From Swiss-Prot:
Ranges of the WD repeats in the UniProt entry: 14-57, 61-103, 135-174, 180-219, 221-248, 255-294, 323-362, 391-440
Biased composition (Acidic residues): 113-124
Keyword hit for Ion transport: no
Name of the protein in its database record: Probable cytosolic iron-sulfur protein assembly protein 1
Biased segments, Low complexity type: 8-21
The family this protein is said to belong to: Belongs to the WD repeat CIA1 family.
Amino acid sequence: MSDPRPNTLSPLATLTPPSSSRTWQTAPHPTLPIVATACSDRSVRVYSLTSFTLLHSITGGHKRSVRAVSWKPHTQGQSVLATGSFDSSAGIWRREEQGGNEDDFTNRRVGGAEDEDGRDDDDEDEYQFSCILDGHESEIKSLSWSPTGQYLATCSRDKSVWIWEELEDDNFETVAVLQEHDGDVKCVAWHPEEDLLASASYDDSVRLYREDSDDWVQVACIAGKEGHGMTVWWVEFEGSGISGKDFRVQRDGLSEEQTQHVDSMERSGPRLATCSDDRTVRIWRRKPRERAENASSNTGIPSIIRSAAIDEDWYQDAILPQVHERAIYSVSWSRTTGLIASAGSDGKIIIYKERWRKQTPNGVDTDNMQIDGSEPASLTEWFVLAELFSAHSVFEINHVTWAKRADKDKRYDGEEVIVSTGDEGEVKVWTLDEVADPPQRDA
């Protein structure tokens, strides 16, 4: 029997004015209560999450639709935005923030000289086009800054993944051109703690890369019978560390197997979420290297998957409940609560939550989640916490993400909202009304 779903997603706002053309993706700023939306009219629209109104319309840098946006982390005194376009180029935009420190910006929405509707009066406060990154032979589908902001990854319909390094004064150097995929590369995402990059593709595979002796190389490939059966649209890593609201954080009362499971997951590091045309959301987990190396040396039998010390083994940790009826375009893993949101072609937004299984398998090796393609023997399970139909009327949802809530009706510090980006040009903001905690495993 499926779990009851008393939790609801309630509409909070539609960002105004909406775009008159298709919107592809919305990226929350890492520190400010604003989001940037990539639009088919060749613009990027920057909205306030305080007033839900348009603050800036960034134009003039691209000749075709803007497909992807990504804010650079850890900037001081300025906001830096990367944009990827169907014109095959990536753009870098900068805005010098007026006001002093990030807390001032947050309290005053985005800082600078603004009138009552949140618009800037001074053209100098607008985003300035800084530089263009050329190299791809076809449209850019996704881009992402590394956790430190040192690298920018881009991917394209030309089947390649590029890694750029910013040197100084808007001078970017190409440090890698990775051509492991056999099809259109849909998405790239960085690990939150390491310079480890994941990519998803039309070739149904997920690939992971890292630097080895000054060269970027593929260290893992998730494909075939262990992977998705159709196009993989999105990849996103779990947040760094275990959230204070995560069900695993309270160790009192856990069984020995559960405690071992938590320890093993901490050794594995953040997991990876993917979604696909095959209508599934899947979670992948890295096999802890210490156990892998010890097992190989103790038996004298090397891993059949790993061909070198730098290679990694990633196993399927879970397939989330299959609720979507058509392709899933986007997943977002909350770094505050550990909840996952998904959205796609069927217009649904689904929220999933992880918990301990009521009955756990006996004798589970928590470091080996899957063997020879068999189903993973996990101690946890995911269930549907909330489900919303027709979130954008009859239109597809191209992207979904979690963001910090910043309006005056915020219910508590750290509250999050869900931001969905639709094919009709609207960006909508939703609250999750969680009225009951799920039942937990008996101690």
